[in-house]
């Protein structure tokens, strides 16, 4: 019980962000959902995540690694590999295979003073490349507000439309992020990802390294690291 109380206290303190990424999949977003934010033109991201049992359709702890690049601030593409635990020809069990998937995101409408930004995206679209556990098309809206001076509060809402019967992403999702003006490199977030609730935080170190950690329904903990830089200036 004390551990859960401390986690809850940490999560409530932690709802903040100008660092923008759907951390678990290597895309722009919150912890495990996309947002309609976009990175700056020419931004490259690469990294890896620990994904415990319960975060994926698999019944084992695993992880992924990814690369991501944003073109012209309206088009973003990423490619990721999720490690699969299998049995090798000699009977040894280990992470010998990978589930490969990609994401493409297009922003037809940038956020304005009175309207949200809009992004349309697709995850894992190619049916001939595997089981397509993350196969979805989605639309998402994000609107940010300035509160208490220059603090930033952002609200996100969206909907997943699965493109196959195996997809683990389906239905509505949404989240909130809060970024204090005194330290924009710190991020605290809470979200519903269509299957469960996630609460956590992220921070950027030395301008290029971002770390994140979050809990899924207070049952497991996920985290990761990523490197980001601008290839075009």
Predicted regions and their residues:
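Cleavable N-terminal export/targeting peptides
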Residues: 1-27, 233
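Transmembrane beta-barrel domains of Gram-negative outer membranes and organellar outer membranes
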Residues: 21-137, 142-149, 159-161, 180-186, ...
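A mid-sequence, solvent-exposed acidic-amphipathic segment
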Residues: 153-187, 191
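Acidic surface patches and DE-rich sequence motifs
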Residues: 193, 205
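Short, solvent-exposed amphipathic alpha-helical segments in soluble enzyme
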Residues: 206-207, 228-230
